[in-house]
Amino acid sequence: MQKLSNLLPEGFHDSLPPHAEAGSRLERDVLDTLASHGYARVSPPLVEYEDVLTGRMTGSAKSDLMRFVDPISQRTLALRPDVTMQIGRIAATSLSEAARPLRLSYSGQVLKLRSGQLRPERSRLQIGAELIGTDSVAAASEIVSVAIEALSRAGLTGITVDFTMPDLVDVLSAGPLPLSAAQAAEVRSELDMKDAGGLTDLGAVGYLPLIEATGPFDDAMAKMRSFDSDNLLASRLDGIAAIAANIKDKANLTLDPTERHGFEYQNWFGFTLFAEGFVGAMGRGGSYEIPTADGDMENAVGFSLYPGPLIDAGFSAKPKDVLFLPLGHDEEAASSLRAEGWRTVAALSDSDDAKTLGCTHHLDGEKPVAI
Protein backbone atom coordinates (compact mmCIF):
# COMPACT_ATOMS: atom_id res chain seq x y z
CA MET A 1 0.00 0.00 0.00
CA GLN A 2 1.34 3.42 -0.96
CA LYS A 3 2.10 5.66 1.99
CA LEU A 4 -0.13 8.75 2.08
CA SER A 5 1.70 12.07 1.92
CA ASN A 6 0.56 15.51 3.00
CA LEU A 7 3.54 17.22 1.40
CA LEU A 8 2.69 20.32 -0.63
CA PRO A 9 4.95 22.41 -2.90
CA GLU A 10 6.93 25.14 -1.19
CA GLY A 11 4.81 28.23 -0.61
CA PHE A 12 1.45 26.43 -0.72
CA HIS A 13 -0.76 25.26 2.14
CA ASP A 14 -4.22 23.92 2.92
CA SER A 15 -6.68 26.30 4.53
CA LEU A 16 -8.40 24.42 7.33
CA PRO A 17 -11.22 25.16 9.78
CA PRO A 18 -11.77 27.73 11.16
CA HIS A 19 -9.49 29.78 8.88
CA ALA A 20 -11.13 28.71 5.62
CA GLU A 21 -14.56 29.80 6.78
CA ALA A 22 -13.18 33.00 8.30
CA GLY A 23 -11.48 33.76 4.99
CA SER A 24 -14.72 33.29 3.07
CA ARG A 25 -16.57 35.53 5.51
CA LEU A 26 -13.92 38.25 5.26
CA GLU A 27 -13.94 38.00 1.47
CA ARG A 28 -17.72 38.35 1.44
CA ASP A 29 -17.63 41.35 3.79
CA VAL A 30 -15.10 43.18 1.61
CA LEU A 31 -16.93 42.38 -1.63
CA ASP A 32 -20.22 43.51 -0.08
CA THR A 33 -18.55 46.81 0.79
CA LEU A 34 -17.39 47.25 -2.80
CA ALA A 35 -20.82 46.31 -4.14
CA SER A 36 -22.45 48.91 -1.90
CA HIS A 37 -20.44 51.54 -3.77
CA GLY A 38 -21.54 50.29 -7.18
CA TYR A 39 -18.60 48.03 -8.07
CA ALA A 40 -19.87 45.10 -10.15
CA ARG A 41 -18.01 41.84 -9.71
CA VAL A 42 -16.14 40.09 -12.51
CA SER A 43 -14.29 36.79 -12.29
CA PRO A 44 -11.46 36.22 -14.80
CA PRO A 45 -9.84 32.78 -15.12
CA LEU A 46 -6.79 31.69 -13.18
CA VAL A 47 -4.96 30.74 -16.40
CA GLU A 48 -4.43 32.72 -19.61
CA TYR A 49 -2.26 32.48 -22.69
CA GLU A 50 1.18 33.70 -21.70
CA ASP A 51 1.50 36.20 -24.54
CA VAL A 52 -1.90 37.74 -23.78
CA LEU A 53 -1.12 38.03 -20.08
CA THR A 54 2.41 39.39 -20.46
CA GLY A 55 1.27 41.84 -23.13
CA ARG A 56 -0.36 43.84 -20.34
CA MET A 57 2.45 43.46 -17.80
CA THR A 58 5.42 45.69 -17.12
CA GLY A 59 8.70 45.50 -15.26
CA SER A 60 9.74 42.48 -13.25
CA ALA A 61 6.23 41.02 -13.10
CA LYS A 62 6.86 39.08 -16.32
CA SER A 63 9.58 37.07 -14.60
CA ASP A 64 7.24 36.05 -11.77
CA LEU A 65 4.97 33.86 -13.90
CA MET A 66 4.38 30.14 -13.44
CA ARG A 67 4.22 28.74 -16.98
CA PHE A 68 3.34 25.43 -18.62
CA VAL A 69 2.47 24.16 -22.10
CA ASP A 70 -1.18 23.41 -22.82
CA PRO A 71 -1.27 19.82 -24.15
CA ILE A 72 -4.35 20.68 -26.22
CA SER A 73 -3.33 23.90 -27.99
CA GLN A 74 0.44 23.44 -27.55
CA ARG A 75 0.58 27.12 -26.56
CA THR A 76 2.30 28.35 -23.41
CA LEU A 77 -0.12 29.19 -20.62
CA ALA A 78 0.57 31.19 -17.47
CA LEU A 79 -0.97 31.40 -14.03
CA ARG A 80 -1.86 34.96 -13.13
CA PRO A 81 0.39 36.71 -10.57
CA ASP A 82 -2.05 39.63 -10.36
CA VAL A 83 -5.70 40.16 -11.29
CA THR A 84 -5.46 43.86 -12.18
CA MET A 85 -4.20 43.39 -15.73
CA GLN A 86 -6.99 40.88 -16.34
CA ILE A 87 -9.53 43.51 -15.33
CA GLY A 88 -7.86 45.83 -17.83
CA ARG A 89 -8.22 43.21 -20.56
CA ILE A 90 -11.92 42.76 -19.77
CA ALA A 91 -12.50 46.52 -19.73
CA ALA A 92 -10.74 46.94 -23.08
CA THR A 93 -12.49 44.03 -24.82
CA SER A 94 -15.67 42.48 -23.42
CA LEU A 95 -16.74 45.69 -21.66
CA SER A 96 -15.24 48.20 -24.09
CA GLU A 97 -18.70 49.57 -24.91
CA ALA A 98 -19.86 49.76 -21.28
CA ALA A 99 -20.56 53.21 -19.87
CA ARG A 100 -17.68 55.03 -18.21
CA PRO A 101 -16.67 55.43 -15.49
CA LEU A 102 -16.79 51.66 -15.16
CA ARG A 103 -16.65 50.24 -11.64
CA LEU A 104 -15.50 46.61 -11.31
CA SER A 105 -14.54 44.43 -8.36
CA TYR A 106 -12.91 41.02 -8.15
CA SER A 107 -11.61 38.35 -5.82
CA GLY A 108 -9.40 35.39 -6.61
CA GLN A 109 -6.18 33.51 -5.99
CA VAL A 110 -2.95 34.72 -7.58
CA LEU A 111 0.24 32.69 -7.86
CA LYS A 112 3.84 33.82 -7.69
CA LEU A 113 6.88 32.01 -9.00
CA ARG A 114 8.84 33.13 -5.93
CA SER A 115 7.73 33.92 -2.40
CA GLY A 116 8.45 37.23 -0.67
CA GLN A 117 10.47 37.89 2.47
CA LEU A 118 7.52 38.94 4.62
CA ARG A 119 4.98 36.50 3.16
CA PRO A 120 6.33 33.05 2.19
CA GLU A 121 3.12 32.09 0.38
CA ARG A 122 3.27 31.70 -3.39
CA SER A 123 -0.51 31.54 -3.60
CA ARG A 124 -2.62 34.24 -1.98
CA LEU A 125 -6.04 35.82 -2.13
CA GLN A 126 -6.32 39.17 -3.92
CA ILE A 127 -9.45 41.32 -3.59
CA GLY A 128 -9.78 44.65 -5.32
CA ALA A 129 -11.69 47.32 -7.17
CA GLU A 130 -10.96 49.24 -10.36
CA LEU A 131 -12.55 52.50 -11.51
CA ILE A 132 -11.96 52.70 -15.25
CA GLY A 133 -12.32 55.69 -17.53
CA THR A 134 -10.87 58.44 -15.34
CA ASP A 135 -8.05 59.11 -12.89
CA SER A 136 -9.44 62.41 -11.61
CA VAL A 137 -9.06 63.58 -8.02
CA ALA A 138 -12.70 62.64 -7.41
CA ALA A 139 -12.13 59.11 -8.74
CA ALA A 140 -8.90 58.68 -6.79
CA SER A 141 -10.55 59.96 -3.61
CA GLU A 142 -13.36 57.44 -4.03
CA ILE A 143 -10.94 54.56 -4.54
CA VAL A 144 -8.86 55.40 -1.46
CA SER A 145 -11.97 55.97 0.64
CA VAL A 146 -13.55 52.67 -0.44
CA ALA A 147 -10.30 50.82 0.30
CA ILE A 148 -10.24 52.27 3.82
CA GLU A 149 -13.88 51.34 4.35
CA ALA A 150 -13.25 47.79 3.13
CA LEU A 151 -10.38 47.31 5.59
CA SER A 152 -12.46 48.78 8.39
CA ARG A 153 -15.30 46.41 7.53
CA ALA A 154 -12.80 43.56 7.79
CA GLY A 155 -12.08 44.63 11.37
CA LEU A 156 -8.86 46.62 11.02
CA THR A 157 -8.17 49.74 13.06
CA GLY A 158 -5.43 52.36 13.04
CA ILE A 159 -5.33 52.43 9.24
CA THR A 160 -2.57 54.48 7.59
CA VAL A 161 -2.49 55.59 3.96
CA ASP A 162 1.03 56.20 2.65
CA PHE A 163 0.98 58.21 -0.59
CA THR A 164 3.68 58.01 -3.24
CA MET A 165 4.46 59.36 -6.71
CA PRO A 166 5.52 56.27 -8.69
CA ASP A 167 6.83 58.03 -11.82
CA LEU A 168 8.50 60.92 -9.98
CA VAL A 169 12.06 60.08 -11.04
CA ASP A 170 10.92 59.65 -14.65
CA VAL A 171 9.37 63.13 -14.64
CA LEU A 172 12.36 64.80 -12.99
CA SER A 173 14.99 62.99 -15.06
CA ALA A 174 13.24 64.08 -18.26
CA GLY A 175 13.15 67.70 -17.05
CA PRO A 176 15.06 69.78 -14.52
CA LEU A 177 17.23 66.94 -13.15
CA PRO A 178 18.31 65.08 -16.32
CA LEU A 179 19.55 61.50 -16.10
CA SER A 180 20.24 58.75 -18.58
CA ALA A 181 18.15 55.60 -18.32
CA ALA A 182 21.00 53.81 -16.54
CA GLN A 183 21.55 56.71 -14.15
CA ALA A 184 17.83 56.92 -13.40
CA ALA A 185 17.80 53.24 -12.42
CA GLU A 186 20.72 53.84 -10.04
CA VAL A 187 19.05 56.90 -8.54
CA ARG A 188 15.84 54.96 -7.94
CA SER A 189 17.83 52.27 -6.16
CA GLU A 190 19.53 54.81 -3.87
CA LEU A 191 16.21 56.52 -3.16
CA ASP A 192 14.72 53.14 -2.27
CA MET A 193 17.43 52.74 0.35
CA LYS A 194 17.19 56.41 1.41
CA ASP A 195 20.96 56.54 0.85
CA ALA A 196 22.07 60.18 0.75
CA GLY A 197 25.72 59.16 0.37
CA GLY A 198 24.89 56.97 -2.58
CA LEU A 199 23.08 59.81 -4.35
CA THR A 200 26.02 62.11 -3.73
CA ASP A 201 28.44 59.55 -5.13
CA LEU A 202 26.28 59.33 -8.25
CA GLY A 203 26.38 63.10 -8.68
CA ALA A 204 22.61 63.24 -8.18
CA VAL A 205 22.59 65.76 -5.34
CA GLY A 206 19.52 67.41 -6.83
CA TYR A 207 17.51 64.38 -5.70
CA LEU A 208 18.64 64.58 -2.05
CA PRO A 209 15.64 66.65 -0.85
CA LEU A 210 13.35 63.77 -1.81
CA ILE A 211 14.80 61.67 1.01
CA GLU A 212 13.81 64.33 3.54
CA ALA A 213 10.32 64.75 2.05
CA THR A 214 9.10 61.61 3.79
CA GLY A 215 6.90 61.21 6.84
CA PRO A 216 3.66 62.75 8.19
CA PHE A 217 1.69 64.03 5.23
CA ASP A 218 1.51 67.77 5.90
CA ASP A 219 5.22 68.13 6.70
CA ALA A 220 6.32 65.96 3.78
CA MET A 221 4.01 67.79 1.37
CA ALA A 222 5.41 71.15 2.48
CA LYS A 223 8.93 69.89 1.73
CA MET A 224 7.82 68.66 -1.70
CA ARG A 225 6.32 72.08 -2.47
CA SER A 226 9.62 73.73 -1.53
CA PHE A 227 11.51 71.24 -3.68
CA ASP A 228 9.25 71.94 -6.67
CA SER A 229 10.53 75.48 -7.22
CA ASP A 230 9.68 75.52 -10.94
CA ASN A 231 6.14 74.10 -10.39
CA LEU A 232 6.80 71.08 -12.61
CA LEU A 233 5.02 68.89 -10.06
CA ALA A 234 2.39 71.42 -9.02
CA SER A 235 -0.61 69.67 -10.56
CA ARG A 236 0.42 66.30 -9.13
CA LEU A 237 1.04 67.71 -5.68
CA ASP A 238 -2.26 69.60 -5.79
CA GLY A 239 -4.05 66.40 -6.77
CA ILE A 240 -2.52 64.31 -3.98
CA ALA A 241 -3.18 67.10 -1.46
CA ALA A 242 -6.83 67.19 -2.56
CA ILE A 243 -7.16 63.41 -2.19
CA ALA A 244 -5.62 63.62 1.27
CA ALA A 245 -8.02 66.40 2.27
CA ASN A 246 -10.96 64.22 1.24
CA ILE A 247 -9.92 61.28 3.44
CA LYS A 248 -8.04 62.93 6.31
CA ASP A 249 -10.76 62.04 8.83
CA LYS A 250 -10.74 58.36 7.85
CA ALA A 251 -7.08 57.35 8.26
CA ASN A 252 -3.61 58.47 9.26
CA LEU A 253 -1.76 59.99 6.31
CA THR A 254 1.91 59.86 5.35
CA LEU A 255 3.90 60.63 2.20
CA ASP A 256 6.92 58.84 0.73
CA PRO A 257 7.24 60.34 -2.77
CA THR A 258 9.85 57.88 -4.06
CA GLU A 259 8.41 54.58 -2.77
CA ARG A 260 8.33 52.13 -5.70
CA HIS A 261 7.74 48.69 -4.21
CA GLY A 262 4.56 47.29 -5.70
CA PHE A 263 4.05 50.22 -8.08
CA GLU A 264 5.41 48.83 -11.35
CA TYR A 265 2.65 50.27 -13.55
CA GLN A 266 1.13 53.17 -11.58
CA ASN A 267 1.85 56.71 -12.73
CA TRP A 268 1.03 60.03 -11.05
CA PHE A 269 -0.10 58.75 -7.67
CA GLY A 270 -0.07 55.58 -5.62
CA PHE A 271 -0.88 54.58 -2.07
CA THR A 272 -0.08 51.79 0.37
CA LEU A 273 -2.41 50.70 3.15
CA PHE A 274 -1.14 49.77 6.60
CA ALA A 275 -2.98 48.86 9.79
CA GLU A 276 -2.20 48.82 13.48
CA GLY A 277 -0.81 45.48 14.64
CA PHE A 278 0.50 44.35 11.23
CA VAL A 279 4.04 44.76 9.90
CA GLY A 280 3.49 44.54 6.16
CA ALA A 281 1.17 46.33 3.77
CA MET A 282 -2.50 45.34 3.69
CA GLY A 283 -2.89 46.56 0.10
CA ARG A 284 -1.83 49.01 -2.59
CA GLY A 285 -3.42 51.10 -5.28
CA GLY A 286 -3.10 54.11 -7.52
CA SER A 287 -3.56 55.51 -11.00
CA TYR A 288 -2.54 53.73 -14.20
CA GLU A 289 -3.36 53.34 -17.89
CA ILE A 290 -5.07 50.48 -19.73
CA PRO A 291 -4.17 49.71 -23.37
CA THR A 292 -7.29 49.73 -25.53
CA ALA A 293 -8.11 47.70 -28.65
CA ASP A 294 -7.50 50.69 -30.94
CA GLY A 295 -4.04 51.39 -29.53
CA ASP A 296 -4.99 54.24 -27.22
CA MET A 297 -4.66 54.34 -23.45
CA GLU A 298 -7.52 54.65 -20.96
CA ASN A 299 -7.05 56.14 -17.50
CA ALA A 300 -8.00 54.15 -14.43
CA VAL A 301 -7.55 54.02 -10.66
CA GLY A 302 -7.85 51.04 -8.37
CA PHE A 303 -6.57 49.07 -5.42
CA SER A 304 -5.76 45.51 -4.41
CA LEU A 305 -6.01 44.02 -0.92
CA TYR A 306 -4.20 40.92 0.31
CA PRO A 307 -6.14 39.73 3.38
CA GLY A 308 -4.04 36.66 4.16
CA PRO A 309 -2.48 38.16 7.32
CA LEU A 310 -5.93 39.14 8.58
CA ILE A 311 -7.24 35.62 8.11
CA ASP A 312 -4.16 34.13 9.81
CA ALA A 313 -4.69 36.50 12.75
CA GLY A 314 -8.25 35.29 13.22
CA PHE A 315 -10.12 38.27 11.78
CA SER A 316 -13.71 37.39 10.81
CA ALA A 317 -13.46 34.17 12.83
CA LYS A 318 -16.75 34.14 14.70
CA PRO A 319 -17.36 31.07 16.89
CA LYS A 320 -20.94 29.91 16.47
CA ASP A 321 -23.06 27.69 18.64
CA VAL A 322 -23.47 24.22 17.17
CA LEU A 323 -26.56 22.16 17.93
CA PHE A 324 -26.31 18.37 18.23
CA LEU A 325 -29.30 16.50 16.82
CA PRO A 326 -29.72 13.07 18.44
CA LEU A 327 -31.05 10.04 16.62
CA GLY A 328 -34.79 10.31 16.08
CA HIS A 329 -34.84 14.08 16.62
CA ASP A 330 -37.73 16.30 15.57
CA GLU A 331 -36.80 17.22 11.98
CA GLU A 332 -39.29 20.09 11.76
CA ALA A 333 -37.87 21.62 14.93
CA ALA A 334 -34.32 21.23 13.59
CA SER A 335 -35.29 22.84 10.27
CA SER A 336 -36.93 25.74 12.10
CA LEU A 337 -33.82 26.28 14.23
CA ARG A 338 -31.57 26.26 11.16
CA ALA A 339 -33.81 28.94 9.66
CA GLU A 340 -33.13 30.99 12.80
CA GLY A 341 -29.38 30.68 12.21
CA TRP A 342 -28.44 27.61 14.21
CA ARG A 343 -25.76 25.30 12.86
CA THR A 344 -26.70 21.66 13.38
CA VAL A 345 -24.81 18.36 13.41
CA ALA A 346 -26.98 15.25 13.19
CA ALA A 347 -26.03 12.01 14.90
CA LEU A 348 -25.50 9.12 12.50
CA SER A 349 -25.11 6.43 15.17
CA ASP A 350 -25.48 5.88 18.91
CA SER A 351 -21.73 6.30 19.32
CA ASP A 352 -21.70 9.90 18.06
CA ASP A 353 -20.76 12.24 20.92
CA ALA A 354 -21.89 15.87 20.93
CA LYS A 355 -18.78 17.30 22.62
CA THR A 356 -16.40 15.27 20.49
CA LEU A 357 -18.12 16.65 17.39
CA GLY A 358 -17.63 20.22 18.64
CA CYS A 359 -21.24 20.92 19.59
CA THR A 360 -22.19 23.48 22.22
CA HIS A 361 -25.87 22.49 22.57
CA HIS A 362 -28.09 19.47 22.09
CA LEU A 363 -31.68 19.34 20.96
CA ASP A 364 -34.07 18.38 23.76
CA GLY A 365 -37.47 17.98 22.17
CA GLU A 366 -37.86 21.25 20.29
CA LYS A 367 -35.44 23.37 22.34
CA PRO A 368 -31.63 23.74 22.31
CA VAL A 369 -30.02 23.02 25.68
CA ALA A 370 -26.44 24.02 26.50
CA ILE A 371 -24.07 21.10 27.01
Residue ranges and their predicted role:
Residues 160-164, 325-326:
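Short internal beta-strands
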